[in-house]
A protein has these predicted regions:
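Bacterial Sec-dependent signal peptides at the C-terminal "C-region" and cleavage site
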Residues: 3, 16-24
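Bacterial N-terminal signal peptides that target proteins for export
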Residues: 1-7
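Collagenous Gly-X-Y triple-helix signature in extracellular proteins
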Residues: 22-292
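Bacterial N-terminal signal peptides
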Residues: 8-17
């Protein structure tokens, strides 16, 4: 009997070990690509639209322009409809024993980098002084993450818990990017329905891919009045910091010991669902999904 239970216990241990291996978070792999996860929830859809790599982006953009024009003519306030919160989809850029670095798959909203060109020119080398950094670590974080989820997030080198990627990261082959001009397209990102119809994110024409320009967390090295951004080809360029239609593609770091995988297979269509766990009990905490 003892031997039988020992064999059963061994089998269970092997099963759990295999399950953990299958659910292991890792960074980009040249052969296997990215691991995808969901964590937190944010306004993304209105009429149930999904980004679909820009298939609907141009339609949302033209629809919003038409509706805004009609509202202005009728002297009414533009009303795109009620936005719905959906799980935020992230790429796992890198993962080790200290942190899991996540980059939003989509542009989640549009915003100025900073409202004062003079202030940005003088202090823009410090991303934390910008209006956008304050929005990411204030309004956005409060809307997107529960207290338990925020507790699982790490502060990145004085940037706060929510930040933007920089050019070094978006040129790093270890994270799936490249410095080669022919690979600029890898940096393209598409905006959500909410980002386009509600916050006014710009959409490049269909011939260019229907994607959206988005900010990096850096000041331009050639014109300090401007911020670095991703342009129509996916190249790293610069734009005036008061541009209201440039997108934000948030990034976060998570504590590996403060999260757990609950479902999914890690693909873009079936991402792992990450949930925060209690330090005391090791059990899942309340998430934004449960608070909805």
């Amino acid at each position: 009997m003892i031997r039988r239970w020992s064999l059963i216990l061994l089998a269970l241990m092997l099963f759990c070990s295999a399950a953990m291996a299958e659910g292991e978070l890792r960074g980009y792999s040249e052969g296997d690509g990215y691991i995808y996860v969901t964590f937190g929830r944010y306004f993304q859809s209105i009429d149930g639209g999904t980004p679909d790599n820009g298939k609907q982006a141009w339609q949302w953009s033209t629809q919003a322009k038409t509706e805004r024009k009609a509202a202005k003519k009728a002297k009414k306030e533009y009303d795109p409809g009620e936005a719905r919160k959906d799980p935020i989809l992230w790429r796992v850029m890198s993962a080790d024993g200290e942190k899991v670095f996540l980059l939003s798959e989509y542009v989640l909203f549009a915003s100025v980098m900073h409202s004062s060109i003079k202030e940005f020119r003088d202090y823009g080398s410090d991303f934390t002084i910008t209006d956008l950094s304050r929005k990411l670590n204030g309004e956005f974080m409060a809307d997107a993450f529960s207290e338990a989820e925020q507790a699982a997030m790490l502060e990145r080198d004085g940037l706060g818990k929510v930040f933007l990627p920089d050019s070094r990261e978006l040129e790093d082959p270890a994270m799936g990017f490249s410095k080669q001009k022919s690979q600029n397209k890898l940096r393209k990102a598409w905006a959500t329905e909410y980002a386009i119809r509600v916050t006014g994110a710009y959409v490049y024409q269909p011939k260019n891919g229907n994607h959206t320009p988005y900010w990096l967390r850096e000041q331009s090295t050639t014109d300090k009045r401007q911020g670095r951004s991703i342009k129509s080809t996916g190249a790293i360029g610069r734009l005036g910091v008061t541009g209201e239609d440039v997108g934000a593609r948030p990034a976060i770091d998570l504590r590996p010991d403060a999260i757990r995988i609950e479902g999914g297979s890690g693909t873009k269509d079936d991402p792992y669902r990450l949930v925060p766990v209690s330090e005391e009990t090791g059990q899942p905490e309340v998430t934004t999904e449960e608070l909805e």
